[in-house]
Swiss-Prot record:
Residues 247-251 are annotated as: ACP-binding. Its main location: cytoplasm. GO terms for cellular component: cytoplasm. GO terms for biological process: fatty acid biosynthetic process. It comes from Lactobacillus delbrueckii subsp. bulgaricus (strain ATCC 11842 / DSM 20081 / BCRC 10696 / JCM 1002 / NBRC 13953 / NCIMB 11778 / NCTC 12712 / WDCM 00102 / Lb 14). This is Beta-ketoacyl-[acyl-carrier-protein] synthase III. The gene is fabH. Its EC number is 2.3.1.180. Pfam families: ACP_syn_III (PF08545), ACP_syn_III_C (PF08541). Homodimer. It is an enzyme of class 2 (transferase). CDD domains: KAS_III.
Length: 319
């Protein structure tokens, strides 16, 4: 019997960076105001690229040296797809020539990558099989650029992993996927009209968030799902090498570390440079750490997300 493992990670971000000072030219804000509240200094904005373009770049990097025909599954976690249909994953499939892959998008907002990784691990049962799990977002197309409470938070980007079913021992050790639909009103984007014939299709509703309620939710529920995940695996908090949290707000990450009574050094952050990239953030962070040699084979890692739904998720993996 063989088991699934993360064989490779990758990321892709536009080179076009927008600083806090740049934003202060178009809205009432400042570098100090943004950094103090979020830890964000800059974010990447994709000017001429769709979500699928970012995901395709990641997929091509992940499949370098691999046979695309051997890919069984492609999941793209996103809340900003190119279109309602076709799925972004189908566009990725066509671009990389993975003609044998089942393809679909998964929408769980900023928990999406952790959700998708868990789904892929459970679906990938063929020995030697491969899956692409990608988080990709172009949230710059969804935010209201006159609303400083949300526009300053988000950036565009993509990250992903190649999952292979070829390990001789389990690498995906436990997971917790939670949803709290009664809290849905606190974070929303892209609503369509409830009327059947409202006239021509217009722009989707912009991103809206009750920041205070989301902060309270994240700082309470993320420690809960992480603790439950580790209890399921029989692993202690101190045994984990890295906690890769959704990069929404530096203050949230610090507070989660504090609630778990763990050193902040175990909770790396790159939000200062990239902002909140939603479903892409954990994958981007993992790929960046792997490139720097800070996340290595054998490391015990928790991936955790939280976001719209509201949702919270944690996955314990051995790299």
């Amino acid at each position: 019997m063989t088991y699934a493992r993360i064989a490779k990670s990758s990321r892709y971000l536009s080179e076009f960076a927008v600083s806090n000072d740049d934003l202060s030219q178009i809205m009432e804000t400042s570098d100090e105001w943004i950094k103090t509240r979020t830890g964000i200094s800059s974010r990447r904005i994709s000017q001429q690229e769709n979500t699928s373009d970012l995901a395709i770049q990641v997929a091509k990097q992940l499949l370098a040296g691999e046979d695309p025909a051997g890919v069984d599954l492609i999941i793209v976690a996103t809340m900003s797809p190119d279109a309602y249909t076709p799925a972004t994953a189908a566009l990725v499939q066509a671009a990389v020539g993975a003609e044998n892959a089942a393809c679909f998008d998964l929408s769980a907002a900023c928990s999406g990558f952790v959700y998708a990784l868990d789904v892929a691990e459970k679906m990938l049962r063929r020995p030697g099989g491969m899956a692409l799990v990608i988080g990709a977002e172009t949230l710059s197309k969804l935010v209201d650029w006159q609303d400083r409470t949300t526009a300053v938070l988000f950036g565009d980007g993509a990250g992903g992993v190649l999952v292979k079913n070829d390990a001789l021992e389990p690498h995906f050790l436990a997971s917790q996927l939670k949803s709290y639909g009664h809290l849905a009103k606190f974070l929303s984007a892209g609503q369509t009209s409830p009327q059947p014939f409202p006239g021509p299709v217009t722009d989707l509703a912009p991103f809206k968030m009750n920041g205070r309620e989301v902060y309270k939710f994240a700082t309470h529920k993320v420690p809960e799902v992480i603790t439950a995940c580790l209890e399921e695996a029989g692993v202690g908090l101190a045994e984990v090498d890295l906690f890769l949290l959704h990069q929404a707000n530096y203050r949230i990450v610090k507070q989660v570390a504090r609630r778990l009574d763990l050193p902040e050094e175990k909770f790396p952050c790159n939000i200062a440079e990239y902002g909140n990239t939603s479903a892409a953030s954990e994958a981007i962070l993992l790929a960046e750490l792997a490139e720097e040699g800070k996340a290595q084979a054998g490391d015990l890692v928790v991936l955790a997300g939280f976001g719209g739904g509201l949702t919270a998720a944690a996955q314990l993996v051995r790299l």
